Amino acid sequence: MSETRPSAHPDVEIIEATKGFERFLRMDVFRFRYRRFSGGWSAERTYDVLRRGQAVGVALYDPDRDEIVLIEQLRLPALLAGASPRQLEVAAGLVDVGETPLMVAVRETREETGLAIKGEPIPIQRYLPSCGASDESVDLFCARVDATEAAGLHGVPEEGEDIRVVVKTLAEVEALLDAGAIENGHTLVALYWLLRHRDHLRQLWGPTAAKNGHGADLLSASPIEKPRI
C-alpha cells in the first residue's frame, strides 16, 4: 500500500496529507497546489485519493491450442455502474507486503484458475486505471499455460471468492471485444496486447520453437522482450 505522503515532485507541493478512513479500501485527504501551465502556482486544493496501491493482471495463453484462460466472478461495483455483475477478466490481484508483481502473477494464477505458469511471464505494461481518483497502478503480464488443465471453480474461500474458469479461443475473444462484452479495464489492455502479439507468442512458445531451440533467439529479437515493470 502507498504511503500517506507521496514522493516529492517539483510541480506539486503537498501541504498536508491525512488519513481519511480505512477498511478494505483506504482514502486519504490531501491539501496541495501545483504549477500551472500558464506559469505560477495554483490556489490550494483539497483532494480525496483512494489509496488502492499496486495490482497485477495476467493474460493466460495456450499457444498450442490458441486459447486464453479467463475467469468469471461477481463484481458489485460493475452492477452499480450499470454493467453486468458477472465480469469476464484475466486473473488478477493486489501486491501484498514483501511480494513482487511477478510473484503475484504466479500466485493469482494458481489461486484463481488452479493452473501453473510455464516458464517466465512476459511483462506487458504498467498503467494507471483511474489516476483522477486513485493511486492504483496495474502491472500486466502474459504467461503460458496448458488450457486443457483449466476447469472448475476456484478462489480463496477465506476471502469469499467464487471464481469460474472460462476458456476461449482467441477468435472468440476477438468477437467478444468487438461486441463490447468485455468491460474490465486491465482485461481489455491485456487482451488487445495479446491479439497484437499473438503470432510472435506462438513462434516463441509453440512446439516448433521448442523443437528447434529457437525460443531464446526469438525472445532476444522480440519487440516485447524488454520488461516495462
Model regions and ranges:
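Active-site-adjacent beta-strand/loop module that shapes the phosphate/pyrophosphate-binding cleft
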Residues: 32-36, 130-151
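Acidic, metal-coordinating catalytic segment for phosphate/diphosphate chemistry
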Residues: 20-65, 79
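NUDIX/MutT-family hydrolases
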Residues: 155-181
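A short, amphipathic edge element
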Residues: 2-18
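Beta-rich strand-turn-strand
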Residues: 98-103, 112, 116-118
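A short coil-to-beta-strand element that immediately follows conserved catalytic motifs
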Residues: 13, 116-124
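Conserved Nudix-box catalytic region and its N-terminal flanking loop in Nudix hydrolases
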Residues: 47-50, 59, 67-107, 157-159, ...
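Acidic two-metal-ion nuclease catalytic site recognized across multiple nuclease folds
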Residues: 199-229
